[in-house]
Regions:
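Intrinsically disordered, low-complexity linker/loop segments enriched in Gly/Pro
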Residues: 64, 84-132
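Short acidic-glycine-tyrosine-enriched beta hairpin
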Residues: 118-130, 271-289
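Glycine- and acidic-residue-biased ligand/ion/polar-headgroup-sensing regions
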Residues: 52-55, 73-107, 142, 244-271
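Loop-centered beta-sheet repeat module
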Residues: 111-167
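Ligand-binding loop in jelly-roll beta-barrel domains
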Residues: 51-55, 64, 74, 85-88, ...
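Basic, glycine-rich polyanion-binding accessory segments appended to enzymes
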Residues: 205-252, 257, 263-264
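Transition-metal
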Residues: 1-100, 164-216, 239
């Protein structure tokens, strides 16, 4: 599995300005960069790129209001935007209808197949999912995605591991049938699961939007995928997709934003200041920026903002 933390203020994996200090140091030194987030001291936005070469472990995140969280811990709501997917690949999202807590306990304790008790969702480029607290989930082999998350500044986003495909590893972390299993957070995972929430098709209707592949060969466009008046509403994220070739105007915003280029090229124009971005690069757009002229070159990019 390949994982890149594109925009992060977490102490263990901080983003760093090119040839400069960490992003967290820059934001804490100038509250104007944060806009609405200034009272927090830094940003709660965390953006990752994940390329799953194998099935990832089944995980779950608690809500921010979970009473079991320590003072230094935070919930971690997230979204998944599918960039690429091999034929037959997909996600595991929630338990299937009729699966009980006792069924999951037995599967874990007997080293059974927890994946057989989950809803498998085939995916295509352009699919977008909101992963709500209390929803068991896993990224399947062959999926490449962008993952924006919200983690309270100065705190550690919490993930509980439900199941890891009964794999074992040697001391270096390589697969080894004679090695040790990774830690499973059985009781905590079970306790934060939304057992009475929607499952299957009912869950997908609430959390999935199939936007289709980005129109890289068309004229420049800016499409809101998550947010007000968008296909999916969210109290956490505001997500937009840029695609095509040509110029477009990006309005000012009073929030810090993350722009990640997924394909092609993107050039940002702020008066006489020009910033060129290539595939795989991410720019943090401060809240104090005015309107920008964005030049797209057969581009596909995602703009991530906290609501």
């Amino acid at each position: 599995m390949g994982e890149a933390w594109e925009l992060s203020v977490e102490p263990d994996f901080p983003s760093r300005i090119v040839d400069g200090p960490t992003l967290d140091e820059v934001l804490r030194a100038d509250p104007a960069l944060l806009g609405k987030e200034a009272p927090l001291g830094s940003t709660a936005l965390l953006v990752k790129l994940i390329d799953a070469a194998d099935d990832l472990s089944v995980q779950i995140h608690p809500s921010d209001t979970d009473p079991a969280l320590a003072a230094e811990e935070s919930g971690k709501p997230e979204a998944w935007y599918i960039i690429g997917a091999e034929p037959g690949s997909g996600l595991y999202l929630g338990f299937r209808d009729g699966v009980s807590r006792q069924d999951i306990e037995m599967a874990i304790d007997r080293e059974g197949a927890v994946d057989a008790l989950m809803s498998f969702v085939p995916v295509s480029p352009g699919d977008l999912f909101l992963i709500e607290p209390g929803t068991p989930h896993a990224i399947g082999k062959g999926v490449l995605l962008l993952e924006p998350q919200r983690v309270s500044p100065g705190k550690r986003g919490i993930t509980y591991r439900y199941w890891d495909w009964n794999r074992r590893y040697d001391a270096t972390g390589r697969l080894d049938p004679g090695g040790k299993a990774r830690a499973i957070h059985r009781e905590r995972a079970l306790s934060v699961t939304s057992w009475d929430g929607p499952r299957g098709d009912a869950l997908l209707e609430r959390v999935r939007h199939r936007a289709g592949p980005a129109a890289k060969d068309g004229t420049a466009s800016l499409e809101t995928l998550v947010g007000d008046c968008a296909p999916i509403g969210s109290e956490v994220f505001f997500l937009q997709r840029l695609a095509g070739s040509g110029d477009l105007a990006l309005p000012a915003d009073d929030r810090l934003r993350s722009l990640t280029v997924l394909d092609g090229g993107v050039t940002l124009h702020d008066g006489d200041t020009v910033l060129e971005l290539a595939r795989g690069q991410t720019a943090a757009l401060p809240a104090c920026l005015g309107p920008l002229r964005v030049e797209l070159d057969v581009a596909h990019a995602m703009l991530c903002t906290l609501a």
